UniProtKB/Swiss-Prot annotation:
One of its GO terms (cellular component) is cytosolic large ribosomal subunit. It holds the Pfam family Ribosomal_L35p. One of its GO terms (biological process) is translation. InterPro entries: Ribosomal_bL35, Ribosomal_bL35-like, Ribosomal_bL35_CS, Ribosomal_bL35_sf. The keyword Magnesium does not apply. It comes from the Bacteria. PROSITE patterns: RIBOSOMAL_L35 (PS00936). The gene is rpmI. The lineage of its organism: Bacteria, Bacillati, Cyanobacteriota, Cyanophyceae, Synechococcales. This is Large ribosomal subunit protein bL35. Keywords: Ribonucleoprotein, Ribosomal protein.
Length: 65
């Protein structure tokens, strides 16, 4: 059986944790930041855990993570 390929787009966006979960960046922290409060921007800077409903899809895209 051939080796499975990693989806490079997913590899750039997600990082596996030691427990097997995946971390992701938050949306809405790219541009149009003038009207957002400093607290909101600070919160958007932090990483988030991928939801359990999406974990299987990310795992399929990154088989060796």
């Amino acid at each position: 059986m051939p080796k499975l390929k990693t989806r490079k787009a997913a590899a750039k966006r997600f990082k596996a944790t030691g427990t097997g979960k995946f971390m992701r960046r938050r949306a809405f922290h790219n541009h149009l930041l003038d009207h957002k409060t400093p607290k909101q921007k600070r919160h958007l800077k932090t990483k988030a855990v991928v939801d359990r409903t999406d974990e299987e899809r990310v795992t399929l895209m990154m088989p060796y993570a």
